[in-house]
């Protein structure tokens, strides 16, 4: 998602060509079929990330970019009746699907959902025990990523934790990374996420 006029882009990382309004419209449009497109392929990495987060009963956990709500539901189960999960997503239609999912599972009372921008989180300082992002950080243009992470730092407890599942250029990406970049370069409206240096951004 790009609304920034800055030219300070990281070498080797592709630009985000869509504006935030275009990104919102895209996810509003595909909300009904998103699970068919991504749920199966994203699940293994999502579950690995959730194990790292190690959510405990009674905690306050934030998910940024919650989509159709499957992760929120798992987090709501993990925090139990004494905890709370919070979610922010740019898409109103995704938010509606997530609310329906949580309601159907009897978990809506443990959740608070917002439709908005992660560059300006509507939560108080030191209010979260943990933050989870799954294939969300790479949707932001390079100059905007530090803004998102600064907001994460603000709302986290000093000893809080953040887990980011991302398409990362670090490690052994090989053909998968090249495939993501080729698709993003030629079909940015279909492949809106692109590989980033996720670990470096979090340091």
Tell where the protein language model's regions lie, with residue ranges:
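N-terminal, positively charged/glycine-rich alpha-helical extensions of SAM-dependent methyltransferases
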Residues: 1-31
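Conserved alpha-helix/loop element of class I SAM-dependent methyltransferases that forms part
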Residues: 40-57
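Class I SAM-dependent methyltransferase SAM/SAH-binding core
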Residues: 62-120
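Helix-to-beta-strand junctions that scaffold the AdoMet/dcAdoMet cofactor pocket
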Residues: 80, 140-141, 156-157
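A short acidic, Gly/Pro-enriched loop at the edge of an enzyme's catalytic core
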Residues: 119-131
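A short glycine-rich, Lys/Arg-flanked "PGG" loop and its adjoining helix->strand segment in the class I
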Residues: 146-158
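Conserved beta-strand signature within the Rossmann-like core of class I S-adenosyl-L-methionine
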Residues: 159-166
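Short alpha-helix
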Residues: 190-203
């Amino acid at each position: 998602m790009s609304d920034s006029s800055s030219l300070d882009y990281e070498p080797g990382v592709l630009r985000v060509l869509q504006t935030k309004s275009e990104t919102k419209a895209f996810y509003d449009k595909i909300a009904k079929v998103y699970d068919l497109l991504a749920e199966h392929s994203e699940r293994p990495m999502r579950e690995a990330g959730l194990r790292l987060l190690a959510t405990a009963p009674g905690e306050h956990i934030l998910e940024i970019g919650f989509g159709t709500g499957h992760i929120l539901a798992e987090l709501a189960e993990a925090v139990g009746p004494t905890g709370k999960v919070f979610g922010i997503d740019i898409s109103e239609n995704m938010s509606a699907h997530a609310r329906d999912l949580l309601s159907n599972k009897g978990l809506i009372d443990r959740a608070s959902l917002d439709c908005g921008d992660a560059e300006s989180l509507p939560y108080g300082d030191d209010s979260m025990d943990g933050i989870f992002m799954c294939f969300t950080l790479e949707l932001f243009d390079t100059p905007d990523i530090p803004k998102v992470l600064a907001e994460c730092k603000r709302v986290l407890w000093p000893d809080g934790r953040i887990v980011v599942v991302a398409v990362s250029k670090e490690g052994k990406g090989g053909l998968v990374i090249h495939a993501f970049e080729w698709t993003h370069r030629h079909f940015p409206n279909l492949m809106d996420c692109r590989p980033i240096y996720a670990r470096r951004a979090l340091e």
